[in-house]
Amino acid sequence: MKMKSLFVTILALFSTALSAHWQPVGHAEYTWGPFHVYSVGLFSETSSYQANQYPLMFSIKYEKPIEGKNFAITLIKEMEAQQLSTDDTTAWLKKMQEIFPDFSPNDLLNFVALENKGYFIANDTVLNHEFDAKFTRAFIDIWLSPKSSFVKLQPKLLGKEKDTQDHQEFRYQPASDPFDEENAMPELPPNYDPQNNLNG
């Protein structure tokens, strides 16, 4: 019974991400020295961003191999800079390190931010954990807070400075038919095994 409930939850989250009419707000490249490490894109349903606006989606496309556990540490360090509770960040780090896979070039990690929760999608797999509103706000602030260490990326991420980069690179193409909004059950990729896709 628990497995059935979990599977229904994952399908609901997957449906939310697919049925939202995502429009690009902006995107930016994160570099370290001469290396292009990843690109990050911001999407909303209005092609613009305002404070406390939901839903939002952040898409990270990796250009270099990155271990999932190390990327989780990077995110938590940014959150700790916001002076959040250590109890919160410790729990968040543990959970992200449990669910994040290792990332290869061209992999996508999406974070869908809803008003009271958020969740990650790695390529076409919903990662099995719902984060609360506090985590969701902290994740948004990593990229958009005035105190963020990524503040130099914000003009492009918010669409205030244009880039020649194509937003289509943030589109992952799963091996399934397009989502039919009239169908409450999206078609999953061939050979989809819910047991293997319940990460964490």
Predicted regions and their residues:
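Absolute protein N-terminus
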Residues: 1-3, 20-21
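Terminal leader/tail segments of proteins
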Residues: 20-200
